[in-house]
Each structure stands twice: as structure tokens, then as C-alpha cells.
Amino acid sequence: MKILLLGIGNVLYADEGVGVHFVNYLTENYRFSHPEHQIDLVDGGTLAHSLIPTLTQYDHLIVIDTVNAAGVGAGEVYFFDFDKAPAEIDWQGSAHEVEMLQTLIMMELVGDRPKTFVLGVTPTVLEPMHMGLTPKIHAAIPVIESAILNHLRELGVTCERINNIEINSLIPTAYKRGMEA
């Protein structure tokens, strides 16, 4: 089985970049292995539709992003099967969130969507550009980390901690990392 951890988001808009920042954090701090499965981590930025050729190569997809949820405050973490989204998830967030939803729906229509899970956190809405995470999203990082590690372990993946780099130290160079991929 091929497993993809896909970080989505716009690093120029604070919390909207949490998926990208978190995938960079995992890349720097963990080594994932399984004797039979391939595990890849990708910074998908705001590419959405352009990711389709990549996404079709995987059997199991975990999208890490912000999610909009009606009546829920910033910093709430959700982990769900894309086919069974909680009722409060309204997909009315940023442009990249809507595009990713459309991408997954298009892939489903043609039978190319892998089994998909969403690991999302509700963002603080900020209008001006700002590279960094708000305090509520930063406080949610351990919950996000625990959710992804538990899910991978359920799949039999070994999650080995190889570093202890803070997510905030990775943010200033996030835009460069996406270009290197």
C-alpha cells in the first residue's frame, strides 16, 4: 500500500498554512517505515487540481489542512474519513480548501480517489498576510501530531522520532521548501 501525508495550505496567510507547516514538521522530526508500505510526505501548497496525477498513485491519502466548521472556535482538531465528514464541517473556508474539496470530488467521479482521511484544524481567520501560526493553532499541534501518529500506527507504520525541531523554527523557510519538492 502507498500512503501519502499531504499538507495543504497557503503559508502566507497564518493558520491557512498549518498543513504545509505540519508536513514539514513531520519530515524533520520523524522517520516512517513499514516493511510492505511506502509512506510519503508532500507539501501540496495550494496546488489542488494540479495534484491529481500525484494523488492517483496512492492507495491511502491523509490530507492535513484547515477545515471550516460551523459554530466551532479556532484550534479544534478533526480527524475523519472523507466519506463520513462530521455534520459541522461545512467546507466553506478558504479558496484552497474549496479547491481541495473539488479535487477530491472530481477524483471520486472518475474512480481515482484513494481512501481519504482529513486531519484538519479550525483556523483563526486573519485577513492580512502573516507567516506564522496563531497561538490557538500552535496549541493544537500536539493534538494533530498525536492523531496522525495514532492513525499511522494503526496501519502498522513505525513512527520513529529522529529530531526535536519546533514547528515555529520551520515556518520562516516554508516557502522555500515547497519549491525544493
Stretch-by-stretch model annotation:
Residues 1-2, 115:
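Secondary-structure boundary/capping motif
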Residues 3-6, 11-84:
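Nucleotide and nucleotide-moiety/phosphate-recognizing core
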Residues 66-116:
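Helix-loop-strand module that forms the ligand-binding subsite of alpha/beta enzymes
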Residues 10-11, 85-87, 124-127:
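A short, flexible beta-alpha/helix-coil linker loop
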Residues 7, 72-75, 93, 128, ...:
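Residue-level signal for pocket-adjacent positions within structured domains
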Residues 17, 21, 46, 95-101, ...:
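Conserved active-site and cofactor/substrate-binding residues in soluble primary-metabolism enzymes
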Residues 100-181:
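Phosphate-binding/catalytic loops
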